[in-house]
Regions:
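Blade-loop segments of beta-propeller domains
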Residues: 66, 70-72
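Major-groove recognition helix of helix-turn-helix-like DNA-binding domains
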Residues: 73-92
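Noncatalytic carbohydrate-binding groove/subsite architecture in carbohydrate-active enzymes
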Residues: 113
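Single, function-defining residue in the core of a domain
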Residues: 1-58, 62, 66, 88-90, ...
Length: 385
């Protein structure tokens, strides 16, 4: 009989151990755990994400009950206190670096975005995760609660998180946006919370395109008007120059597009520095920003990033980055296996079959059952008669 790894083992194999070890050497600060390796910690954290364990006790007990399977994963049982200490003391920067490495691997096999243009397309947004003020005082957000904010740049080629920064809930989105490095020719889509004319000017000068919604209090002067196809929902296509008190921060001409959604009848006004793509394409690009909202909703519903197994800042960041690595592993599993199933169904099936020895294709496309020989039925009839 041919040897077959468990699904969990197959997923972990997407992470080259030599790269894991190299990152481990680069982030070797903090307390040393002689009998609890970084790989062991990562394996336990990944198990909790993929199986939806509700607590530290639940996760450790469930994992330790699979001692035989742990051996084949290169891990071993661990005490709950040792695991908690490792999450608190081993720097989360290691898992951030591992997440970035995994994105680079996953983007190679991911499908391209749906648009005809070849520019890279990204959506930029942030999502708040509420925390208990008593348990997480370091993340104080308002008088009665704490929170952390996940700032994310979503790559529309495969809908992969390309950049993630985890901050306190008080940190404004635009502050993190300025730290993101994008390739020339990229298109980044964001909502009005990211309106910063100085940043828009920097993007323009670096050859990066942006698409956003114009603020209602924006002051500008129209310098050119272009005809539009109103049958496509377009209302206007103009070239403008900002003339308000902060207009000097972005002296470059911008493109202002009016659009009415034919389904919701809601009117939108978009602002961009791209004068090449059609006005309808710009409107469609902004509508695609909804994909990052879907991404946030998916990870909150299917991964463990709302209940934490540690209360320190380091433990919270570690758990979130491991959750994002789990998301990338699921995407990589899906794209390489080329199965036509959504991530929602994929993670549900994997949760039930994590330690089953089979391929992913066998779970969704099981081999046909062999037909029983008619002689067997005749023998059964003779036996009971």
């Amino acid at each position: 009989m041919a040897h077959c790894n468990t699904l969990f083992h197959s997923m972990l194999n997407f992470i080259p151990r030599h790269q894991f070890a190299a990152l481990e050497n680069q982030h070797s600060t903090g307390r040393k755990f002689r009998n609890f390796s970084r790989w062991n910690q990562f394996t336990h954290l990944m198990f909790m994400q993929l199986t939806g364990r509700a607590s530290l006790r639940d996760g450790i007990q469930s994992m330790n009950s699979r001692a035989r399977d742990l051996y084949h994963l290169g891990a071993k049982p661990v005490a709950r206190a040792t695991f908690a200490d490792a999450n608190n003391m081993r720097p989360a920067s290691f898992y951030q670096a591992l997440f970035e490495k995994m994105y680079q691997r996953c983007r190679i096999v991911s499908p391209k975005h749906k648009f005809k243009f070849k520019n890279k397309l990204y959506s930029l947004d942030a999502s708040v995760i509420d925390l208990s003020l008593g348990a997480f005082p370091w993340a104080c957000f308002r008088r009665t609660k704490s929170a952390v904010k996940i700032h994310t740049l979503l790559d529309h080629s495969g809908f992969l998180p390309a950049f993630v920064s985890i901050t306190d809930g008080k940190i404004h989105e635009s502050k993190v946006a300025k730290s993101i490095r994008l390739a020339k020719g990229s298109i980044v889509v964001e909502d009005r919370a990211y309106t910063d004319y100085k940043w828009f000017c920097q993007l323009q000068e670096n050859g990066i395109f942006f698409v956003t919604r114009q603020k209602t209090n924006a002051v500008y002067r129209v310098t050119e008007r272009r005809q539009v196809n109103k049958n496509q929902g377009l209302c206007s296509d103009q070239t403008i120059v900002l003339t308000g008190s902060k207009g000097h921060l972005c002296p470059h001409p911008l493109r202002r597009i009016g659009y009415r959604d034919p389904e919701t009848k809601k009117h939108y006004v978009f602002l961009t520095n791209n004068f090449t793509l059609s006005a309808k394409t710009i409107a469609d690009i902004y509508k695609e920003r909804w994909q990052i909202e879907i991404f946030f909703r998916w990870i909150k519903q299917n991964l463990k990033i709302k209940a934490f197994v540690g209360n320190s800042r380091n433990a919270v960041m570690t758990q979130i980055y491991v959750a994002l690595i789990a998301y990338l592993l699921l995407c990589m599993f899906k794209y390489l296996s080329k199965i036509s199933v959504g991530l929602q169904n994929l993670i549900r099936v994997i949760q039930l079959n994590l330690f089953r020895r089979c391929t992913l294709e066998e779970l969704f496309e099981p081999p046909p059952h062999k037909k029983l020989n008619n002689n067997i039925y005749r023998q059964l009839e003779i036996t009971f008669n």
